[in-house]
Amino acid sequence: MQHPGHLIRLALSLPPHIALAKAARFARRLADRRIRGWLYRDRCSYPQSPGRLRRSLDALDVSIPDSFGETRLLFEHRFDLLGSGPVRVAHGERYKGFGPHRYGPSPPLPADWRDAVTAELSPGNRKRARTILDQIPGGYTPIDWHVDFVSGFRWSPATWGGGIAYAHLPGVDIKLPWELARMQHLPRLALLADAGTLPALAAEFRAQALDFMGSNPPGWGVNWACAMDVAIRAANLILAWELFRARGATFDEAFEDELAASLLAHGRHVMANLEWSERHRGNHYLADVCGLAAIAHALPDSPESAEWRSFATTELNAEILRQFTPDGANFEASTAYHRLSAEMAMVTAALLLGRGESLSDEALARLAAAVRFAAHVTKPSGEMVQIGDNDSGRFVRLETEDRPLDMAPLIAAAKGLFDLDLPVPADTLSVTRVVAALAGGRRFPAPPPVRRPLPTGPVENSPCLRLRIMPPAPAALTGLEAVAYPDFGLFLWRGPRAFIALRCGPIGQNGQGGHAHNDQLAVEIEIDGVAWTRDPGSFVYTADLAERDCYRSVMAHFAPRRGSGEPARLLAPFRLEDRAGAKLVRFGDDMVGRHVGFGSPVQRRVAIEDGAIVIEDTPGEGEHVLRSPEDLARLWGLILPFSPGYGRKG
């Protein structure tokens, strides 16, 4: 059922031509759902097994400690994803809801749950699905893979994946089932195992994989709606199987046949639904390529898998150079999406190189530069500066502890492939060892960074609003290193005790701005572990479009203001007007940037003078001395709760 009020609010937030285009796409999706569902409902979409899978990892003794009872939670099917909190995901559960919006629950399953699960599926898939589910031993409680386990809304598994509705009801977030079905918890099961628990954890991996395969026929349901998520799921299924085998676990032939058949279905689905665009392809297409690389090297050799191997290697080379700018930053104007895309490229590069494929020297140098960017945007507290959107997306999760604003797992992955003198926490050693094993021991030098000359032009000396930010310990502001990323639009002063960042540059995605915020000339400051001002994050996407725009607004950022006006229109939930045209004027002893988003030029200058951070906004008037983060927040009206990750506040 569509919710007219939610759809009307969405339409009214868009320019007429975009609203009409979206309405047309929505109508086509509804038609596609009905037509394909009718055409394919009596067909079986499961392929036959292509044969035994090929291994990339030999014996590997690597593990992570169970420091917070994660093993028990995974056995109980309790997941903490995208702000859900630890919640049991099962049929018939009632969930907390998103704000006032709460759906469900769906009916609980009877004792003979296999019949109930297969009865929901398209008729042509029921027989094969039942064969798969029958391989799961008694005592297992199935996961409900089709539910948003915050709002409680549930998608029908009998709906053709390409016609799945999303952003259609208030509070409903399709990212919840997608995140769970990425299966990033399954490699963790393998790493959590020790000699005594390995058989039980391997059995749980087998049961969950079969549960998913039997409950999600290829092409049907919410978990086949987005090729990116299909690709990431395949990579994690393969990695989990590899890690269990490398640690000594064995699996029966029937299961391995089903796993191989499922991976073949994943590969065919991704190839048939590549998220390619001449101008605006980004992390989704990169994920497609990386998932295909993993699938192609796991499947038995055949003309089909050979074609995928060649395609994935060629495209990974090309997309690294396209999606990472010459200074190493990702082109989507988001530090969180930089982490995701760099992690996908890094792990896949290791896999390909370990299997005898080649990447260009230029692509490898670009990856090494991407890791330096990750290190440089990390504040002394260990958290990355949030620029642009943050959906907490990852490719794999192999570290001991999940810290939502942590670049360390990416840096640790790179240390498995490159000779890098970058520190990482000890609890990320597992990441380095797995990536090094995937690379087959191949290592590469990290070329020195490329430094480009930056502008040193004159600044406008007109009346300005002047702020003096006075930290308790002025010495924290001494000895700062200046680091510039002009292609991304981020300029930094970094030291062991202080971090100051100025956002000034492109909105990303070749002007689409799909993951950018109205943050031009925004400043972020951390001193002695205290955030004096910081980007508030993103919170959510389609579950609450009004909240999304609040977090994208200039009013959420410590940036120059003109009343409550926006320097660029929020054209759509994933599109920002390319109007501000922010340009760096000078970077060195001070940082000066300018934009024209309000019609006439706005300039911001940042300097360190006499133990204080001085910020001057032109045009403007007045002077304020700020002695605490609270003073700054009150002056600028920064009231949005901080969101450290998707779906989280505070």
Predicted features by range, described:
Residues 135, 154-159, 163-167, 171-372, ...:
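Aromatic-lined, polymer-binding surfaces characteristic
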Residues 149, 184-187, 495-497, 506, ...:
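Short, flexible loop/turn elements at secondary-structure junctions
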Residues 1-18:
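Compositionally biased, charge-rich terminal segments
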